[in-house]
């Protein structure tokens, strides 16, 4: 089976100078993949020429006249840029011409446009960015990592249901353990939203283990960690910054003297393994969980190596039938809060409208 993916080539801080080389390298190592490169045709072809890939049969160029900038408000992406690379890439997924979309674009815009074009799964009010973070024995699924800055307690419960369904689908665990990210383990800790979310989780049928703290994220304390997108994004980027700092410190210390350089040479295999394990770029690419089709969000600052990993996330998700397994697990195991469209509070980064965005509205004004 050929895995067909659309690439929003104009998204991110670097656009085609990163996305196109990453796509070229990916298809050369994955013969069963076909990537549709969406964006300004001249810019894409210029990069293909640099990569000596103008005639690469596994790549096709899909023109799009507009670009969603990283600082564009959501209303601009939805109402004014209907021929953007982001929108066109998602449209091809909607029409069944591709099985997933990968974008490094503006998070708020990507979430809102994805909801509008692709719609959410039944019972899902807000999609969330979910990613598997490494721990000593495997991984911990964490969500939301940036899609919804402000959440109500019922949204956190629904994130837990989606995380439960995803881990159940991928790992075969009947009752994955759930933790709520907080400033302490005690039930009295946290703001009112967190306290109320804890009450809802304890009253649910989920295997809720209570509050977890930031130092539990990489311990493997629970299978799924739930938080709002503001907290999750800060936690993720703090971790990436720490990993980079540790790698820089080790490099600096082993470069101080001739003796330390000789020691580094002896320790090179260990250092290379360490570098690989802490290189956050290989963890780039997170799923927008809760949509009816697959969308993978890359870091906006990703380089070509990191963006290639995001493409791989989409490729693997298609090959492993993640969407189908998630949908089935949600239907079998989760207890949805109600039909999509109940959310009327307007909170969140992706879109202030409830449920599925019916039509782009002038009221949409959030930025990422």
From Swiss-Prot:
Its EC number is 2.3.1.274. It is found in: Cytoplasm. GO terms for biological process: fatty acid biosynthetic process; phospholipid biosynthetic process. Keywords: Cytoplasm, Lipid biosynthesis, Lipid metabolism, Phospholipid biosynthesis, Phospholipid metabolism, Transferase. It holds the Pfam family FA_synthesis. Residues 334-368 are annotated as: Disordered. One of its GO terms (molecular function) is phosphate:acyl-[acyl carrier protein] acyltransferase activity. Catalyzes the reversible formation of acyl-phosphate (acyl-PO(4)) from acyl-[acyl-carrier-protein] (acyl-ACP). This enzyme utilizes acyl-ACP as fatty acyl donor, but not acyl-CoA. Belongs to the PlsX family. This is Phosphate acyltransferase. It comes from Burkholderia thailandensis (strain ATCC 700388 / DSM 13276 / CCUG 48851 / CIP 106301 / E264).
């Amino acid at each position: 089976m050929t895995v067909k993916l659309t690439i929003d080539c104009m998204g991110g801080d670097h656009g085609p100078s990163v996305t196109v080389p990453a796509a070229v390298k990916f298809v050369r190592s994955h013969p069963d993949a076909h990537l549709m490169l969406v964006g300004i045709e001249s810019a894409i072809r210029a990069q293909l020429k640099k990569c000596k890939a103008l005639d690469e049969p596994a790549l096709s160029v899909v023109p799009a006249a507009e670009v969603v900038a990283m600082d564009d408000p959501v209303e601009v992406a939805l109402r004014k840029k209907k021929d953007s690379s982001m929108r066109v890439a998602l449209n091809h997924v909607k029409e069944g011409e591709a099985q997933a979309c990968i974008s490094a674009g503006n998070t708020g815009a990507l979430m809102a446009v994805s909801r509008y074009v692709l719609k959410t799964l039944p019972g899902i009010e807000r999609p969330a960015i979910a990613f598997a973070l490494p721990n000593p024995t495997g991984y911990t699924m964490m969500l939301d990592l940036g899609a919804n800055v402000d959440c109500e307690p019922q949204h956190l419960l629904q994130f837990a249901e989606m995380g439960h369904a995803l881990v159940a689908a991928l790992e075969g665990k009947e009752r994955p353990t759930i933790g709520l990210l907080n400033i302490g383990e005690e039930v009295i800790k946290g703001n009112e939203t967190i306290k109320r979310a804890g009450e809802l989780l304890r009253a649910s049928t989920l295997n809720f283990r209570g509050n977890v703290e930031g130092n539990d994220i990489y311990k493997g304390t629970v299978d799924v960690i739930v938080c709002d997108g503001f907290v999750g994004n800060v936690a993720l980027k703090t971790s990436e910054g720490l990993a980079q700092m540790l790698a820089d410190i080790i490099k600096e210390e082993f470069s101080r003297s001739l003796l330390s350089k000789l020691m580094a040479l002896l320790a090179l295999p260990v250092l290379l393994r360490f570098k690989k394990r802490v290189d956050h770029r290989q963890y780039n690419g997170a799923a927008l969980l809760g949509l009816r089709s697959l969308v993978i969000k890359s870091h906006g600052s990703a380089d070509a190596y990191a963006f290639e990993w995001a493409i791989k996330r989409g490729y693997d998700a298609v090959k492993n039938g993640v969407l189908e397994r998630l949908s089935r697990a949600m239907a079998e195991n989760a207890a949805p809060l109600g039909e999509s469209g109940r959310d009327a509070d307007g909170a969140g980064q992706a879109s202030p409208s409830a449920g599925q965005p019916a039509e782009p509205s002038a009221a949409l004004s959030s930025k990422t």
